[in-house]
From Swiss-Prot:
FAD binds at residues 13-27. It is an enzyme of class 1 (oxidoreductase). PANTHER family: ELECTRON TRANSFER FLAVOPROTEIN-UBIQUINONE OXIDOREDUCTASE (PTHR10617), ELECTRON TRANSFER FLAVOPROTEIN-UBIQUINONE OXIDOREDUCTASE, MITOCHONDRIAL (PTHR10617:SF107). Pfam families: ETFQO_UQ-bd, Fer4_ETF_QO, Thi4. It comes from Acinetobacter baylyi (strain ATCC 33305 / BD413 / ADP1). Its cofactor is [4Fe-4S] cluster; FAD. One of its GO terms (molecular function) is metal ion binding. Binds 1 [4Fe-4S] cluster. The lineage of its organism: Bacteria, Pseudomonadati, Pseudomonadota, Gammaproteobacteria, Moraxellales. It comes from the Bacteria. Gene3D superfamilies: 3.30.70.20, 3.30.9.90, FAD/NAD(P)-binding domain. This is Probable electron transfer flavoprotein-ubiquinone oxidoreductase. The gene is etfD.
Length: 570
C-alpha cells in the first residue's frame, strides 16, 4: 500500500461548504474577530464546486431577516436582492386543463411573501463570498472535503481534501496530486442537504438518536427567458395537485418572475412517494404543459436546468447539532422551514449562531493562553472547549428555533392526513391557533416505496417535444455539468448485485426514474441478461439516490473537486 505524504495547513476554523450557512458563519466569525481585536483569527472555507455558487440551486424567494442582521446595509453594499415580491398567488391544479386559485386568506400565513425578494441564491452566495473575502476569509473553491480527520481521543481534527488524478482503476495517474489536510480548532459542516460527511458524523456520534427520521424532497428547477410582454417582475406563484395527484404523490410547484425577463420554475416531489413507476423529472415536464404554466413559457427559451434534494423534516428531525470538535449548520443539519418552503434565511441564521459560539469559545481559549492559527494539537488540552454546547443554547433562544417550532407539524400533517385534511389542519395550526401537540412522521422515505405488484398504475409520459418539454440528457447539458472522466465512480454500491437481483424484480429498479440526470440505467445484454450501468459523469449532485434507494445500497461520495454542475444565475 502506497503511503501518501500530505501537506497540512492549520486554521482556527475550517468550514466545509460555501453556501449560505457556511459563508454566514465565516462572515460572523471574522466580523466578531475584528470587532474584538482578534484580527489574526483564521477561517478557511472549502467548496467542492468550481467556484462559489456553482453548486447552489434554490427557488428562490428570500426572507431578508437573516441578511438584515448580518449586513444591515446590504442594499447599499450591493446585495443582489433586486426584485421585491409584488404579487403572491397560490393554485390547485385540478386536472391537466383546470386550475383554481386559492383566496389569499385561505393560504397558511407561513406561505405569505410580503417583504420578501425573488432572487438567484447562487448570485446571493457569490456576493456573500465576496464579502467574506473582504473580511480575509480564505476560500478554496474546487477542493472537495473527502474525509474527516480525528484526534486520538475521537475529537474532530479537521478534514482532508480529495486527491486529484486518481484513475478509474483506483491508481494514481501521471497528474496525481494528493489532497491537503486542513486542521482546525473547530470544523463546521455546511454541505447542504444530505452532506456525505454530515451523514457520517450523524452516524458516528449518534446525533439523530432522539430525532424523527429525516424527510426529503427532490427539487427540479428550470430557468427560462420569456416574452417581455408576459413578464411580471415580482409575481410569485405556488401550487399543488396535478400531475402528482394521479399517483397519490405529494409535493408542489413554483413559478417566480425574476429580473431580466426571466422566470424560475420547478417542482418539489416528496421522496416519501409510494409508486415505483413515478418519474419525478417527467412529472415536472408534464406539469409545464398545463395552460396556467404554459402561457408564460410559450415563445420563451430554457436557459438552465438543475436538481437538488431538499431537506424537509424540520424541528422534529433535527439532529444534535454539536460533536467534539465541530458542528452541523444549514441543511447539513436540516434547518429548512417546510411550512414556508424556505431554507436560505434559516441556513444563514444557523451559521451566524454557530459563528458566534465559535468566536466566543476561541476568545475564551486565547484568554487562557491558547494560540491562534494552531489547531488543537495537544491531546486532552482544555484551553478550548471540546464541544460547542453554546451553539445549541443560542439556537434554543433564537427566532430560528421559535420559527421551526411553530412549523413543526406542517410536514407530518401532510404525510399523515393527505393534501385536503392535512391542508385544513395546517391552516388552523398556522392561521388560527397553535395546536398543543406534536405530530411525528416515523417512516423513512425510502421504505415508503411499494413493490411494482402493489402499485400497478403507470403514469403516461409523452415524448418531450424539445421546446416546452425536454429529456434528461439535454437537461444535463444546460446544467453545464462536467466531471473528469478518468476517476473512480463517486456512486458506490454496497452490493453490486442488488440493482438487478433485488431492485429490478421488486420495484422495476426505481433508480432509472428517480435520478433527474439519467445516471442509472438497466442495460439489456440479450439472452435474458441485464446489467446495471452507472453514468457517473451525468451526476448533478442531487443526492436523491443516496436517499431513495429502497435497498439503501447506494452511497454518494464526493468526486474530484471542481466537478459537477456549474449553475449560472440559479
Amino acid at each position: 500500500m502506497i503511503t501518501i505524504e500530505r501537506e497540512a495547513m492549520e486554521f482556527d476554523v475550517v468550514i466545509v461548504g460555501a453556501g449560505p450557512a457556511g459563508l454566514s458563519a465565516a462572515i460572523k466569525i471574522r466580523q466578531l474577530a475584528i470587532e474584538n481585536n482578534l484580527p489574526d483569527l483564521s477561517v478557511c472555507v472549502v467548496e467542492k464546486g468550481s467556484e462559489v455558487g456553482a453548486h447552489i440551486l434554490s427557488g428562490a424567494v428570500l426572507e431578508p431577516r437573516a441578511i438584515n442582521e448580518l449586513f444591515p446595509n446590504w442594499k447599499e453594499e450591493g446585495a443582489p436582492l433586486n426584485v421585491p415580491v409584488t404579487e403572491d398567488k397560490t393554485y390547485f391544479l385540478m386536472s391537466d386543463e383546470k386550475s383554481q386559485e386559492a383566496p389569499h386568506w385561505m393560504v397558511p400565513k407561513t406561505m405569505h411573501n410580503d417583504g420578501n425578494y425573488v432572487i438567484s441564491l447562487g448570485n446571493v452566495v457569490r456576493w456573500l463570498g465576496q464579502k467574506a473575502e473582504e473580511l480575509e476569509v480564505s476560500i478554496f473553491p474546487g477542493f472537495a472535503a473527502a474525509e474527516i480527520l480525528y484526534h486520538a481521543d475521537g475529537t474532530v481534527k479537521g478534514i482532508q481534501t480529495g486527491d486529484m488524478g486518481i484513475g478509474k482503476d483506483g491508481e494514481p495517474t501521471h497528474n496525481f496530486a494528493p489532497g491537503y489536510e486542513l486542521h482546525a480548532k473547530y470544523t463546521l459542516f455546511a454541505e447542504g442537504c444530505r452532506g456525505h460527511l454530515g451523514k457520517r458524523l450523524i452516524n458516528k456520534f449518534n446525533l439523530d438518536q432522539d430525532a424523527d427520521p429525516q424527510h426529503y424532497g427532490i427539487g427540479i428547477k428550470e430557468l427560462w427567458e420569456i416574452d417581455p410582454a408576459k413578464h411580471k417582475p415580482g409575481l410569485v406563484m405556488h401550487g399543488s395537485g396535478w400531475p402528482l395527484s394521479e399517483t397519490g404523490s405529494s409535493g408542489g410547484w413554483w413559478l417566480y418572475h425574476a429580473e431580466n425577463n426571466q422566470v424560475t420554475l420547478g417542482m418539489i416531489v416528496d421522496l416519501s412517494y409510494e409508486n415505483p413507476h413515478m418519474f419525478p423529472f417527467m412529472e415536472m415536464q408534464r406539469w409545464k404543459t398545463h395552460p396556467l404554466i404554459k402561457q408564460y413559457l410559450e415563445g420563451g427559451k430554457r436557459i438552465s436546468y438543475g436538481a437538488r434534494a431538499v431537506v424537509k423534516g424540520g424541528l422534529n428531525s433535527l439532529p444534535k447539532l454539536t460533536f467534539p470538535g465541530g458542528c452541523l449548520i444549514g441543511d447539513d443539519a436540516g434547518f429548512l422551514n417546510f411550512a414556508k418552503i424556505k431554507g436560505s434565511h434559516t441556513a444563514m441564521k444557523s451559521g451566524m449562531l454557530c459563528g458566534e459560539a465559535v468566536f466566543e469559545a476561541i476568545a475564551r481559549g486565547v484568554d487562557k493562553g491558547g494560540d491562534l492559527a494552531i489547531a488543537r494539537v495537544v491531546e486532552g488540552e482544555d484551553l478550548f472547549d471540546k464541544e460547542l454546547t453554546t451553539y445549541t443554547q443560542k439556537f434554543d433562544k433564537s427566532w430560528l428555533k421559535e420559527e421551526l417550532h411553530r412549523s413543526r407539524n406542517f410536514g407530518p400533517a401532510m404525510h399523515k392526513f393527505g393534501l385536503w385534511i392535512g391542508g385544513a389542519f395546517n391552516f388552523v395550526d398556522q392561521n388560527i391557533f397553535k395546536v398543543p401537540f406534536t405530530l411525528h412522521d416515523l417512516q423513512p422515505d425510502y421504505s415508503a416505496l411499494k413493490t411494482q405488484d402493489q402499485a400497478t398504475f403507470k403514469p403516461n409520459y409523452p415524448k418531450p417535444d424539445g421546446k416546452l418539454t425536454f429529456d434528461r440528457l439535454s437537461s444535463v447539458f444546460v446544467s453545464n455539468t462536467v466531471h473528469e472522466e478518468n476517476q473512480p465512480s463517486h456512486l458506490k454500491l454496497t452490493d453490486a448485485s442488488i440493482p438487478v437481483a433485488v431492485n429490478l424484480p421488486r420495484w422495476d429498479e426505481p433508480a432509472q426514474r428517480y435520478c433527474p440526470a439519467g445516471v442509472y440505467e438497466i442495460v439489456d445484454e440479450g439472452e435474458g441478461n441485464k446489467r446495471f450501468q452507472i453514468n457517473a459523469a451525468n451526476c448533478v449532485h442531487c443526492k436523491t439516490c443516496d436517499i431513495k434507494d429502497p435497498s439503501q445500497n447506494i452511497t454518494w461520495v464526493t468526486p474530484e473537486g471542481g466537478g459537477g454542475p456549474n449553475y449560472p444565475n440559479m
